[in-house]
From Swiss-Prot:
Domain of life: Viruses
Protein name listed in UniProt: Gene 54 protein
Short name of one Pfam family: Metallophos
Organism (species): Mycobacterium phage D29 (Mycobacteriophage D29)
Gene: 54
Paired cysteines (S-S): none
Length: 255
């Protein structure tokens, strides 16, 4: 019996594309996959960002309301339609409140656990697991957000995941880049071969809300990923969101 895993990335709430996120949650409810993995940057948390240090945004007091938005728009709707395993990688944006406390308020570090994203978002209450930095998501595959492990980031789709695959020596699925792409590589000799795969799953962020782009259009692609697992057979698949819709197995979901 095959197993299906839905992998989503970089919602960066409150800068998520609300219609896309709602449609993907609906897809999960309709198809009931065996596992859901959010590969990181569930949250953006702009106020404690190093990019807003010294600006009015630093004093906006958004951490709590932004966390409540994530519960209202993602975690609660997801749990209303799906009771299977949900795991979340910690992305670089997710840990901004925790890092800010350590860097700028060391006298309060004893309270640091309260600023971890899993506590701000009540993962225990929603039955959500924090995944290890490198998670064995399927036979011969690991998932990781993509910002650690010495991975070199590039501006071309799939190339960052490809760099991770070569560095780690295993098939890899990542987020972080906001791009979609799949890129394999074959090693071997004398007709014997070993094929590894690298995959970047895209994002569910509203690019118009990314103020740091300053009106530019980034090389980002909206969508998510799927892994279909049957024993040691693993099929990676991208699901792009284009023209207000996406399709899986011949069925179409409207955004």
């Amino acid at each position: 019996m095959s197993k299906r895993i839905v992998v989503i990335s970089d919602t960066q709430i409150p800068f998520d594309d609300r219609k896309q996120l709602k449609a993907v949650v609906g897809f999960i409810g309709d198809t009931q996959p065996d596992e859901v993995v959010h590969i990181g940057d569930l949250m953006d948390y702009p106020s404690p960002s190093r990019w807003t240090k010294g600006s009015s945004e630093e004093f906006a007091q958004r951490i709590k309301p932004d966390s409540e938005q994530a519960k209202t728009r993602f975690l609660a709707p997801l749990r209303a339609v799906y009771d299977g395993p949900v795991g979340v990688h910690e992305g670089n944006h997710d840990r901004r409140p925790f890092d800010y406390l350590h860097k700028f308020a060391p006298a309060l570090v004893e309270y640091a656990d309260q600023f971890k994203f899993e506590n701000l978002l009540d993962f225990d209450g929603f039955g959500v697991t924090v995944l290890p930095e490198f998670y064995k998501v399927a036979p011969g595959w690991i998932s990781t957000h993509g910002h650690r492990g010495g991975v070199r980031v590039t501006q071309k789709s799939a190339d960052t995941a490809y760099n991770a695959m070569q560095r780690f020596g295993t098939s890899v699925i990542i987020g972080h880049t906001h791009r979609q792409g799949i890129k394999p590589h074959t090693w071997g000799y004398g007709g014997h071969q070993k094929v590894l795969w690298s995959m970047e799953v895209g994002n569910l962020m509203n690019m118009k809300l990314a103020q740091y782009l300053k009106g530019a259009t980034a090389n980002w692609q909206s969508g998510f990923g799927l892994l279909t697992v049957d024993g040691n057979h693993v099929k990676p698949e991208l699901v792009p969101i284009v023209g207000g819709r996406f399709s899986v197995d011949g069925h179409v979901w409207e955004v």
